[in-house]
């Protein structure tokens, strides 16, 4: 399948963008051709895997990326940013040839890392590639197309600076496999919020996908929210920075990763909601959402209360998480050189 260079355009809405900026991994299956184009452009690529207790999957992902490189040199650096996992994640990744760092050793003067988003932000301090691609480290049956498909549009189409992976998300339960039952936070929280407040972004099939790539200059110019708010914040901030015309998505097929308990999905949804509300507040589109005399849930610690019925009776569980925003890494690294 021949890739169409759809060039620069200013989309009038999400529908037009969807038609012009949606690709398939099949368009880039000629990996030798893609690698030649990468070489002609003088580009280097860092693949970053934020990891926490994924010893059962991270090794296979590193092996797949390495094997793809033997066929076509698309990835110049494989980085695993480990959350001091207790299951040997770091050792497994290092044994497969990845460059491994503890998330807490990078930019350590910022204190201990606050979850996935912080690990991704800190990775930019050691990522050497002109392009930085992130991928989830808990993906089962990781396929080469997750790498070359994600990289395809940003290497092949000059006006594209950000690419988001898209895929079907199966959900496996005791009743069998539901082909599109995964991605519950995306379907029940993110997409309704984007339809309401950021309709330009509603053409993205998987806005929270962990597989995405941008040029390092772009990633370095935007702030990163910590924890599970990171993907939502990046989507909004990239859109505001470069516009919809520089963003694309690519169909990667089917992907299956770990499924979170319902309570954890609630916390993830809360993080997405806080990220959207925070950006709306900064843009002057949202007033204070709590009593002014109480701590601001968008900028400080916030209690997430979860009432449940259990065999032992009714329980009120509490989760406290700080929503931290790290500054653009370019500012941090520039300051360290002064």
What does each model-identified segment do?
Residues 161-181:
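Short beta-strand-to-loop element that shapes/binds the nucleotide-sugar donor at the catalytic cleft/hinge
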Residues 44-46, 77, 238:
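Cell-envelope/extracellular polymer assembly enzymes that use nucleotide-activated donors
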Residues 63-75:
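Short, acidic, metal-binding catalytic loop of nucleotide-sugar glycosyltransferases
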Residues 82-90:
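A conserved acidic beta->alpha catalytic loop
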């Amino acid at each position: 399948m021949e890739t169409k260079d759809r060039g620069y355009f200013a989309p009038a809405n999400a529908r037009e963008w969807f038609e012009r900026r949606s690709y398939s991994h099949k368009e880039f299956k000629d990996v030798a051709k893609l690698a030649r184009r990468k070489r002609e452009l003088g580009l280097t690529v860092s693949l970053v895997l934020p990891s926490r207790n994924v010893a059962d999957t991270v090794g296979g992902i590193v092996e797949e990326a390495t094997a793809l490189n033997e066929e076509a040199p698309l990835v110049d650096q494989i980085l695993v940013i480990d959350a001091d996992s207790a299951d040997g994640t770091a050792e497994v990744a290092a044994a497969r040839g990845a460059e491994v760092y503890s998330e807490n050793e990078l930019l350590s003067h910022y204190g201990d890392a606050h979850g996935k988003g912080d690990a991704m932000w800190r990775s930019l301090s050691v990522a050497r590639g002109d392009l930085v691609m992130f991928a989830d480290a808990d993906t089962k049956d990781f396929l080469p197309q997750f790498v070359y498909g994600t990289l395809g549009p940003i290497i092949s189409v000059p006006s594209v600076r950000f690419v988001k992976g898209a895929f079907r998300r199966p959900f496996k339960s005791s009743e069998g496999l539901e082909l599109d039952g995964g991605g519950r936070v995306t379907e029940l929280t993110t997409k309704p919020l984007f339809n309401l407040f950021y309709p330009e972004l509603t053409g993205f099939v998987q806005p929270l996908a962990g597989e995405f790539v941008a040029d390092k200059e772009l990633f370095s110019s935007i702030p990163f929210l910590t924890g599970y708010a990171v993907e939502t914040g990046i989507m909004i901030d990239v859109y505001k920075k470069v516009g919809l015309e520089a963003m694309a998505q690519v169909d990667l097929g089917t992907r299956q990763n770990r499924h979170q308990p319902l309570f954890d999905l609630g916390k993830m949804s809360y993080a997405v909601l806080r990220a959207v509300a925070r950006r709306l507040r900064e843009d002057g589109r949202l007033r204070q959402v709590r009593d002014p005399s109480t701590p601001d849930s968008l900028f400080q610690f916030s209690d997430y209360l979860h009432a449940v019925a259990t065999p032992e009776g009714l329980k009120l569980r509490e989760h406290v998480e700080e929503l931290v925003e790290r500054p653009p890494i370019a500012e941090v690294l520039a300051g360290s050189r002064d």
